[in-house]
Amino acid sequence: MQGFFEGLELPVDRDWMVVGRGRGADLLITEPTISRAHAAIGFDGEEFFVEDLGSTNGTAVNGKRKPRTALNTGDEIQLGKLRLRVTLPSVR
């Protein structure tokens, strides 16, 4: 994350985690360009992904907007004006 949250690590500790500014979000971020339920970050048993949940300002990975995108270490997720850098766990 950039700004106040820069360097903060947020583990995805469940299969489906909603990111948004609404009370029901698992990761609550009070940024005006983020929708109440903006996107979900999760794991489907095969890959980590981010999925837009019909947000107003969209969700992009590495500058490309798609409804759902598989994630890799080093990817940049953009939710409104917020940018997140992806670091995936090592597979042993």
For the regions a protein language model found, what residue spans apply to each?
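A generic structural motif
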Residues: 14, 22-24, 34-36, 45-46, ...
